Amino acid sequence: MKIDLTRLVTESRNPASEQIDTLPTLDMLKVINQQDQLVALAVAQTLPQVAQAVEAIATAFAQGGRLIYMGAGTSGRLGILDASECPPTYGSQPEQVIGLIAGGHTAILKAVENAEDNRELGQSDLKALHLSEKDVLVGIAASGRTPYVIAGMEYARSVGATVVSLACNPGCPMEAYADIVITPVVGAEVVTGSSRMKAGTAQKLVLNMLTTGAMIKSGKVFGNLMVDVEATNAKLIQRQTNIVVEATGVSAEQAEAALAACGRHCKTAILMILGGFSAEQAAQKLTQHQGFIRAALNQE
């Protein structure tokens, strides 16, 4: 069946850039920048739906479920990017947030021919993860019609998982398979059909909110500090110290001493200082309160 791509918003021509190939470099970039400014406004219109998705993801995490991103091309890469940043930022397990791309790891760096049209692959990739009703699947596709993603969404519904659609074309096929529909309509691209641009930026903004919101609601943030950050390099070791200082008001030396006493776990160090607990007591309190510092301090 032939698909009429010209009917899709993401495939339409943008009047603002029809003569972009004739413009001086600075004027060319001004056109791109002006179009980019429309993206955040489009995302703002979807915030109620994004909030629903954040609540669903946080609930899944609390019940031992996972967040699975699924996309092809740029959409798949954006999901993988967001998923890969969760462990170092929030100390989460790598299997808690997973990014799938049509064509597998090879497709991260190089296009895999026909992978996005492979429905069987969409289902088999999720079956390999043993997707269950505890999980949340976010299907990502600028067009909203990618067969790989739609097949995955169909399968996710069949096992009772919560399904979210993230696309940039209103009324797209993906919406029919979703419990929650997020559709930032960013309009035509500067280069016709190049959905890695405005559509990709909109997707990235939404993905940022999904994981950030869910991690905040899971107790991974105290104030605006990433208190579960892992010390995997020199920069992050210093960040841990800074976080404890900011959260407690003690000196860097005192923060370092607390971190050293608890195996460099920011939450434990903060609770030790603010609550006057030993490392063991602080760790126990965090366990009792599911990792929420405020609850452990009875500040809720």
Swiss-Prot record:
SUPFAM superfamilies: SIS domain (SSF53697). GO terms for biological process: 1,6-anhydro-N-acetyl-beta-muramic acid catabolic process; amino sugar catabolic process; N-acetylmuramic acid catabolic process; peptidoglycan turnover. Keywords: Carbohydrate metabolism, Lyase. Pathway: Amino-sugar metabolism; 1,6-anhydro-N-acetylmuramate degradation; Amino-sugar metabolism; N-acetylmuramate degradation; Cell wall biogenesis; peptidoglycan recycling. The active site is at 85 (proton donor), 116. Its EC number is 4.2.1.126. Pfam families: GKRP_SIS_N (PF22645). The keyword Lyase applies. It catalyses: N-acetyl-D-muramate 6-phosphate + H2O = N-acetyl-D-glucosamine 6-phosphate + (R)-lactate. Homodimer. Specifically catalyzes the cleavage of the D-lactyl ether substituent of MurNAc 6-phosphate, producing GlcNAc 6-phosphate and D-lactate. Together with AnmK, is also required for the utilization of anhydro-N-acetylmuramic acid (anhMurNAc) either imported from the medium or derived from its own cell wall murein, and thus plays a role in cell wall recycling. A lyase-type mechanism (elimination/hydration) is suggested for the cleavage of the lactyl ether bond of MurNAc 6-phosphate, with the formation of an alpha,beta-unsaturated aldehyde intermediate with (E)-stereochemistry, followed by the syn addition of water to give product. Belongs to the GCKR-like family. MurNAc-6-P etherase subfamily. PANTHER family: GLUCOKINASE REGULATORY PROTEIN. This is N-acetylmuramic acid 6-phosphate etherase 1. It comes from Vibrio cholerae serotype O1 (strain ATCC 39315 / El Tor Inaba N16961). The gene is murQ1.
